[in-house]
Amino acid sequence: MNRSNLYRKRLMLLSALMFAASLSLSSGARAQDLVVPPQAAPPPMVYIPKEARTQLLSARDEKARTRLSLELAETRLARAEQQTELKQFNAATADLGVYQALMEDALQHLYRAGGTGGSRDLFKRIEQSLHKHAARVEGMRRTTPGEFAGNLRALGKLVRDLRTEALEAFYDDSIM
């Protein structure tokens, strides 16, 4: 009987030690959980939708096309602002990609059109619109969470660069 009591005590001691070891190891394993840092949202897809492209191609001259480009871009920017207020950041990013494509296309079209009659005024109109849009993009960036703010920061820089490009074309000798 003495032997069986000794065996039971050892078994109890061994099981208590195993239990204590498993508790201490589980907390160490939990501390090693992989912490994934938040990832930035992917950049927006920069494209002009088919219906907008059709409208732009049907414009009768550079002045009408520039006005239409600015109206379409203004619409997309306003929609992106509304979606940002509603915390729908993916949809806002998509609209900002279309906005970016429209503004880049408007400038490139004027450059391709060359120095026709009123292109200087059209470059000035684009520059003035971009000046207003830069403040609105910055306002959206301030209310956007960090994962999407990088895209808005890049768009703000692009808007400033496009504005500079429009100003340089405005003062270029070849544009009249």
Question: Where is each model-derived feature located?
Answer:
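N-terminal secretory signal peptides that target proteins for export/translocation
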Residues: M1-K9
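Extended interaction regions within the primary functional domain
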Residues: M1-N2, A20, T116
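N-terminal start-of-domain structural block
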Residues: N2, A29-R30
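Hydrophobic alpha-helical segments, especially transmembrane helices
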Residues: K9-L11, A31
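Short hydrophobic "helix-edge" motifs at membrane interfaces and signal-peptide entry regions
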Residues: R10, A16-L17, L77
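Bacterial N-terminal signal peptides
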Residues: L14-S26
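Long, charged/polar, soluble alpha-helical segments
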Residues: A31-M176
